[in-house]
Amino acid sequence: NLWQFGKLIMKIAGESGVFKYLSYGCYCGLGGQGQPTDATDRCCFVHDCCYGKVTGCDPKIDSYTYSKENGDVVCGGDDPCKKQICECDRVAATCFRDNKDTYDIKYWFYGAKNCQEESEPC
């Protein structure tokens, strides 16, 4: 769920996901359209695509389980759908960590009006 996603961002990227990524670029936050503004926004685009492939549960509200093993987040549990949600979140949080240097404050609360180009397919 979105609360867990925020926690994973904190664990993996060391950033406050709720504040930093809630409304960033064209894809971080609710919805998404246009072209990703930078590598950070592309993390959100890929995350949106990943959520779009999840079937049988709701990525925004269903909870999942994970643990940390040797410093890495490992998704667990018996429910394959919830495990898929966890993997989407884990990959996105890792992407945020790996692309911290591309985060540009000018894209914070960027607004959909700036994202009018045709969206690329997942």
Curated annotation (Swiss-Prot):
Compartments in which it is found: Secreted
Highest rank taxon of the organism: Eukaryota
TM stretches of this protein: none
SUPFAM superfamilies: Phospholipase A2, PLA2
Keyword Heme: no
Cofactor binding summary note: Binds 1 Ca(2+) ion.
GO cellular component: extracellular region
Cofactor requirements of the protein: Ca(2+)
Reaction(s) catalysed (UniProt annotation): a 1,2-diacyl-sn-glycero-3-phosphocholine + H2O = a 1-acyl-sn-glycero-3-phosphocholine + a fatty acid + H(+)
EC annotation from Swiss-Prot or TrEMBL: 3.1.1.4
Binding site residues for Ca(2+): 27, 29, 31, 48
GO molecular function annotation: calcium ion binding; calcium-dependent phospholipase A2 activity; phospholipid binding; toxin activity
Main location group: secreted
Disulphide-bonded residues: 26-115, 28-44, 43-95, 49-122, 50-88, 57-81, 75-86
Tissue-by-tissue expression: Expressed by the venom gland.
PANTHER family, alphabetized: PHOSPHOLIPASE A2 FAMILY MEMBER, PHOSPHOLIPASE A2, MEMBRANE ASSOCIATED
Function in brief: Snake venom phospholipase A2 (PLA2) that inhibits collagen/ADP-induced platelet aggregation, and induces hypotension in rats (activity abolished in the presence of p-bromophenacyl bromide). PLA2 catalyzes the calcium-dependent hydrolysis of the 2-acyl groups in 3-sn-phosphoglycerides.
Additional remark text: Negative results: does not show myotoxic activity.
Name of the featured protein: Acidic phospholipase A2 BpirPLA2-I
Source taxonomy: Eukaryota, Metazoa, Chordata, Craniata, Vertebrata
